[in-house]
Swiss-Prot record:
Cofactor(s) for this UniProt protein: FMN
Residues of the Flavodoxin-like domain: 4-166
Alphabetical list of Pfam families matching this protein: Flavodoxin_1
Protein's name in the database: Flavodoxin
Top-rank taxon, per record: Bacteria
Keywords tagged on the record: Electron transport, Flavoprotein, FMN, Transport
Recorded family membership: Belongs to the flavodoxin family.
Signal peptide: none
InterPro entries to which the protein is assigned, alphabetical: Flavodoxin, Flavodoxin/NO_synth, Flavodoxin_CS, Flavodoxin_lc, Flavoprotein-like_sf
Function: Low-potential electron donor to a number of redox enzymes.
GO molecular function, one term: electron transfer activity
Length: 174
């Protein structure tokens, strides 16, 4: 399998911790992990398979490092790349903006031709009002983690999601 680049932005450490677990479960021999705060366009362009992790802040805003990186992200050509997304949010205190960061990244990346997204995730088991991270079938566009309200479910969700994206990758690449 090709090398996978995992890029995250984190203020509190939650998204970074999730990224580290994804790195572990995907396989440290086939993936590398990068803080978006220390990333440039060329770093991302090195990979054909990318996993982006973002948290949502305040009223549906991107984590600050992703917000700073957004102009660069818009310049990247994601043609023929495979993308998986994950995000952290608080479904109780920010129920009307739950994990919007995933949707914001998705809406930038999807503009490239032939980009393929993998790793959609069920919205069952979460309680929120609204999210830009939902697809037309009401599934999340990627893995959603709530370390504030459901920390006991995070590890199992990460394990299940990494198995899912490995299966999807094997199907696409073989």
């Amino acid at each position: 399998m090709e090398s996978i680049g995992i890029f995250f932005g984190s203020d509190t450490g939650n998204t970074e911790n999730v990224a580290k677990l994804i790195h572990k479960y995907i396989g440290t021999n086939i993936s590398s992990i990068h803080d978006i705060a220390n990333t440039n366009k060329k770093d991302i362009e090195l990979f054909n398979i990318l996993i982006f992790g973002v948290s949502t802040w305040y009223y549906g805003e991107l984590q600050c490092d992703w917000d700073d990186f957004l102009p660069t992200l818009k310049k990247i050509n994601f043609n023929n790349k495979i993308i998986a997304l994950f995000g952290c949010g608080d479904q109780e205190d920010y129920s009307e903006y739950f994990c919007d960061g995933i949707g914001i990244l998705y809406n930038v990346i999807r503009l490239s031709k032939n980009v393929r997204f993998i790793g959609s995730w069920t919205s069952k088991g979460y309680s929120f009002e609204c999210s830009k991270a939902l697809d037309k079938n009401k599934n999340f566009l990627g893995l959603v983690i709530d370390e504030d309200r459901q920390p006991e479910q995070s590890n199992q969700r990460i394990i299940q999601w990494t198995k899912k994206i490995k299966t999807e990758l094997n199907s696409l690449l073989n």
